[in-house]
Structures are given as C-alpha cells and as structure tokens.
C-alpha cells in the first residue's frame, strides 16, 4: 500500500511538472506563432492586391457570412488596399471545403468593381504532384481579370472556362467554386464593404 501511495505521488508530481512545462512553452510560443500568421497574411495580401500604400490589415471590415454547426456566427474579414487614400482593391479569404483531401484556404484579391486581381493558396492538403498544382503560377494566373459576368466559373471538364489539372479535377473545381462564391458574397455586400468606416484589424 505504501508503494502505491509513493507511486501515485511520483506520478502526480510528474504530471504537474509536465503541465507546467507545456503551459510555459505555449506562453512563450503564442506571440511568435501569431506574428508568423500575420506575416503570412501580409505576404498573401501583397500577392493578390494591386500596388497600395496603406496597411490593409489595419483597414478591415468584418461581416457575418453564416452560422457554424453550433449556431455561432461565422465572419469574414475584408482587407482594403488603398493608393493615395483611394480604394485600389479588396482582399478576403475563402475556404473550399470540397478539396480532394480536405479544406483549401485561399486569399482572393479583387478590384473595387469585383474583378479578380489575384489569388493565393494559403493552406491545402492536396495530393503532391496532382492536386497540389493549384499553387502553381499558371493555375492561379487564369483567375486574373475575371469577374462574375465575363467568365464561366466551372472547369473546362464541366464545360467552363478554367483549366483543370491533368489527373486532378476535384482540387481545381473546388478552388474555382470557392472563388466564385466569394465574388458573389462581395457583390451582394459591396457597398457595405467599400463604404464602412475603417476599423483596426
């Protein structure tokens, strides 16, 4: 009985020590991880927006886009890029939930009129050498200059205007659909996104 009590005490001390170490590590790494995410967002914004002279992550509008499974609001942040204080472009993230291997997160940059300036794939788990080719410049470049009215927002295999990837139609189809839905949301809420007062991001 004495050995069991001693063993329980030792295990308790080890568990408490491990918990303390984990909380210290989390505390030390929280800020660097947040800063890394911010830098990733800024890099994507620079890639998809036209030349700007403001900090788009400090000129944002957040709108509720729906509800999650628990009934909580889902919001989308719109980053506004300006040149000489005039709106030059808007960027926002979209999620393609129907990628071959899960979610594909995309940053979309558009003109104030709703034409795509560029897209950047932020995260994906698509098959290397197949679906992963959605990150290649030739694939992303075909979105530039396209709007809802002047493009058929389907891959060519489905009769649309976007090239798919040989052997991997699901990933490109998911990206095209997500970008189209993002453009539709922007069109529905354009005035609110463009004219809302600036808020700190």
Positions of PLM-derived features:
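Flexible, solvent-exposed loop/hinge segments and secondary-structure transition points
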Residues: 2-201
């Amino acid at each position: 009985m004495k050995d069991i009590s001693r063993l329980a005490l030792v295990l308790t001390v080890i568990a408490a020590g491990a918990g303390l170490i984990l909380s210290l590590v989390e505390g030390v790494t929280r800020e660097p991880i947040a800063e890394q995410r911010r830098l990733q967002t800024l890099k994507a914004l620079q890639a998809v927006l036209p030349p700007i002279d403001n900090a788009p992550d400090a000129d944002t509008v957040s709108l509720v886009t729906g509800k999650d499974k628990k009934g909580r609001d889902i919001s989308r942040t719109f980053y506004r890029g300006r040149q000489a204080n005039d709106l030059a472009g808007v960027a926002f993230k979209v999620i393609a939930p129907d990628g071959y291997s899960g979610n594909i997160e995309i940053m979309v940059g558009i003109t104030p009129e709703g034409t795509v300036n560029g897209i950047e794939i932020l995260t994906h788990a698509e098959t290397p050498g197949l679906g992963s080719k959605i990150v290649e410049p030739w694939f992303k470049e075909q979105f530039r200059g396209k709007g809802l009215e002047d493009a058929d927002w389907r891959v060519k295999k489905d009769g649309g205007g976007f090239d798919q990837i040989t052997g991997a139609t699901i990933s490109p189809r998911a990206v095209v659909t997500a970008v189209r839905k993002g453009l539709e949301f922007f069109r529905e809420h354009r005035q609110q996104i463009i004219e809302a007062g600036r808020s700190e991001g």
